[in-house]
Amino acid sequence: FRLDAARKVTAEGAADLVRELKEAKAQWLYLPPDSFLGTLAQDVIIPAAMEVGLPTFASTEQLMQAGALSGLVSRYHSVGQFTAHKVEQILLGKVAAETVPIETLKRFSYQIRISVAEKLKLPPPLPMFNYAEILNDAPIAQ
């Protein structure tokens, strides 16, 4: 993203940056976990990527809901349950917070949005149907 005159991040020119990536021969656009990106994904970033035929790979459920082609995501429900487990260890188990190990979830969901795959003419390889979660719907918020 670019900075404005006050040196704050701005969405201005974000679609142009996506086009520049495609012109520079990018094959995929990775969408990292970023709250500012999340606010722009559905209305700016993903439409710009679709316009130039650049597939998107999401890192969060929010970005998949915004319309990304595919992503390896942790379900927010699972993240909440895992967080509750950690809180329980600290508050009820009286474990000192600094001794609770840093861990990641052990299960992720590989998601593919079929409507986007069809538009980009990028059908998933058949073996992916054995483990991927296939999303047949449109993006959640319109």
Model region roles, listed by residue range:
Residues 1-142:
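Short hydrophobic alpha-helices and adjacent helix-cap/hinge residues
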